[in-house]
Amino acid sequence: MRRCLALGVLLSLLAVPVRGAEGQPYAALTFDDGPSGKYTQRLLDGLAYRGVACTFLLCGYRMEQYPELTQRIYQEGHEIGYHGFSHDSMKTMSRRRIGQELMDSQALLPQGCRPVFFRPPGGVVTDGVHQVAKARNLALLSWSVDPRDWALRDRQAVKQAVLDQVRDGDIILLHDMSASSVDAALDIVDVLHSRGFQLVTVSQLAKLRKTPVTPGEIYTRFPPPEDN
């Protein structure tokens, strides 16, 4: 019952177009490598309760493993982007294989889901990655805040690393692969809300900042006009 009420609140909020208020700070939480079973479920429950939408960069092999979670992410109003199929490094990968990784992932997307962003594993952008992304009409998504949650595995340390750095327009890199990361992410949401931040998807952040998203371009953050 509680989850249904929380989901209803989230969907009602997402049904209203996001409009920027003067002086309102924004940030986008992004989650790599999932979905991951119980940790993604826990994260989605917490986000729904708080009425927050995020951007998930999903691995194809995990979408194949967790189709119901992939569907839930999309149905609950979160943005989905590509993170490759295998999560193998693309540093020396051929353009043909990079394209195949994206095609194999695309086949597993929920009906109607059309990703705008591609974040290669490790954020490594080679000429091949750039060319394939541009050809497939995808922008490349980087980040501006990285607490290295996958390495720290400490809820408080991850939370503090983000809160010490975050600024208006930042894209925050996290992973929904462990309890410490998920719990830190929800703590971060609560503190940023208390600081007046609104948390949105990356696509929403780009629109709020009136920044066109161009295929093949790399996006690290979307700062307010006065920071440009």
Q: Where are the predicted features?
A:
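Alpha-helical scaffold elements lining the catalytic groove of polysaccharide deacetylases
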Residues: Y39-R42, D88-C113, G122-D168, S181-A184
